Amino acid sequence: MAKIARLPDNVANKISAGEVVQRPASVIKELLENAIDACASKITVTIKDAGKELVQIVDNGIGMSRQDALLSVERFATSKISGVEDLDSLMSLGFRGEALPSIASVSQFELKTKPEGALLGFRFRCDGGEPVEESEVNAEKGTTITVRNLFYNVPARRKFLKSNATEFRHIFESVKSLALAYPEIEWKMVSDDEELFHFRTPDIYERLDAFYGENFSLSLIPVSEENDYLSISGFLGKPGMQKRQKLDQYIYVNRRIIQNRMLSQALQQAYGELLVERQAPFALLFLGIDPSRIDVNVHPAKLEVKFEDERSVRTMFYPVIKRTIQLHDFSPDAAEKEPCSIKEGTLDCSSRKLGFQDIAEPASTTSTLYANYRQGAFGDTPFERPAYAEKEPRPSSINTGFERFEPDLREGGDLFSTTLQARPYEDDNTPDPGENDPKIWQLHNKYIICQIKTGMMIIDQHVAHERVLYERAVDVMNQNVPNSQQLLFPQKIELRAWEYEVFEEIRDDLYRLGFNLRSFGAKTVMIEGIPQDVRPGTEVTILQDMITEFQENSSKLKLERRENLARSYSCRNAIMAGQKLSLEEMRSLIDNLFATRVPYTCPHGRPVIIKLSLDQLDRMFGRK
């Protein structure tokens, strides 16, 4: 007698439900994707008890005939594909034909539907996958699916559901991710008889503001690039809007929400030193790609896609994000509050409105800030600035498809032409010849204060110089054009065993940077030449400190070798707080700073520039 037997359909469906239906949010995601595939222009989501008691999805899509409705709850019955070749051109969100039978097998399930042109609709009800009732009913065009008492017949699964607050959070994230991806659809959500939101217009900005706080969308940076292979569009958040989790990163491929480690890492790396450790940037990004170049059938919940050529996708994705970030001014406002995340308790009870309280400051370009500085400090004196693109007008919509573009991934202009040297200390009362410009000052030999067109700008001289040196070091190493000054008297440095190992690891890049070094004995190094930016007499201390910091960064931050070395070099070699600068040196530092690609933060993520507007000053003095 055969020991292997085919499982009954109701048992197979319950097993399948273990992968497809993990929690109420899984039910909602699958049903919403079906509604979108049915060309719905209006969708209403209703839940009770965080989806444990009730989940109901109402859409005005194409509806189904009686025959199609009955087939829809059969395993592997679908209208999305008919052959294996269809998987290569898949544009629908659903395609397996597993969701409805899996959901029906673990709930009290009801489907009511009516196609266009039919006089009556069809209603079908089943409990635990077993048919209970079917009838003709009056109905509007579209489909209504009601799921009650999820996992009522699988107590072990129901027991593992989390608290209502947790389950509601997952539900809301599922609905939000689709409402943002399909702004052309009217969305409404009701929880425990209270309306949470109702989006009647296709305004993506209205939705972002509703989800994250008033005027949130004003502080976002639009992204729009495309070529024959890939399109990228959407929005990026300012570094001040960072979160300590990646819940607020939405990446879509052909409008399908996905989780992709490669893209998430590329996004994180594109922000680079703008991010504080363990923080993640806000992102709402839509990637369009030929469906034949991806495989969406690699995850039970269809949350992952496999790219045919992942390297090419990253090669295009990373520079677009990097360039977009580099072209904007992220300097913090002096009166900005600390950005907040989701309000405490907001998701604990669905009767409260949801949202973030990020401070919405309209994004401006680096060239705008530099122009304000030049006009504030020098009036209408003409100035030259490396070519940065001005901020584009706020788009009326976002492209989520396959619009063509010619990518322009150029970097910013030359870094700088002047080398800063701290001058010898002078008494504070000693007048500086030529220091007659009243619009640039040094405060406590630590900060530079400048008048700008809109108010004032405060620059930390140490981290500003650090940013200049960092970008110069990266470029010099990558271009392999060392700029070294030879020492009249070579200096000898004794290294410990671990220091010498680090030295050997970075020796080639030290040469690229401008250090001319020669081994002299077991653990001794002769310094015969140094970079132009290193002050003679400091080379031994700087090299030793660089080796120490390089090792610390390697163990803590896992940085790429040249980035790590550039950080160490710039930090140890920058002018320090307490060093007096002449007016010309301050001007040179400011000009060099604004010629860098990212002038708003130092390589470690600390702010370089803080702005204080006239409006803020007026409010402080009670003028407004």
Curated annotation (Swiss-Prot):
GO molecular function list: ATP binding; ATP hydrolysis activity; ATP-dependent DNA damage sensor activity; mismatched DNA binding
GO cellular component, one term: mismatch repair complex
Keyword annotations of the record: DNA damage, DNA repair
InterPro entries registered for this protein in UniProt: DNA_mismatch_repair_CS, DNA_mismatch_repair_MutL, DNA_mismatch_S5_2-like, HATPase_C_sf, MutL/Mlh/PMS, MutL/Mlh/Pms-like, MutL_C, MutL_C_dimsub
A Pfam match: DNA_mis_repair
Xref: Gene3D superfamilies: 3.30.230.10, Histidine kinase-like ATPase, C-terminal domain, MutL, C-terminal domain, dimerisation subdomain, MutL, C-terminal domain, regulatory subdomain
Function recorded in the entry: This protein is involved in the repair of mismatches in DNA. It is required for dam-dependent methyl-directed DNA mismatch repair. May act as a 'molecular matchmaker', a protein that promotes the formation of a stable complex between two or more DNA-binding proteins in an ATP-dependent manner without itself being part of a final effector complex.
Name of the protein in its database record: DNA mismatch repair protein MutL
Gene name per UniProt: mutL
